[in-house]
Amino acid sequence: MANEQHVELIKQGSEAWNQWREQNPGESIDLSEADLRGLALAKANLKGADLKKAKLQFSNLAGASMEGANLEAARLQEANLQGAQLENAVVKNCNFMEANLQNTNFQNADIQGSQFNEDVLFGQTNLKGANLLDASGLSVMQIQTSLVDKDTKLPEYLSDDMEDEDFLNSMI
């Protein structure tokens, strides 16, 4: 369960939150299972935070720093994650339906089992080294507009389309 002090602080917005983080750099952040729906958290420092099962629907997380964070089973429907940094983050079993993931950095992130749909916005989304096994709802078009490499693990239903060597070379 979330630390109530952390929940109250983050509800004050990114500026207050980031100022508190600067003053408390060693604090372990627990926002697990917190209801953070619709919050304006653009550029929030959530590095290494525990956001497991957090409700983040409709939240603005554009440009947020979430490197190494645990967002397992978080609800991110219609969230704005444009330009967010999720490098090495755990985002397994998340719901990304209708989210904005343009320019989001998922490099080396664990995205297994997450749910997407055709309304998820991709574009220059960094999926290099990301594990997308068992993710559902992704399209070839979404992957084509993203950055992938030989270490990107795609769901099996996309793997057949991606096996074409010319296609893969055009992606790398």
Regions found by a protein language model. Give the residues of each.
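Tandem repeat scaffolds
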Residues: 5-8, 15-16, 20-172
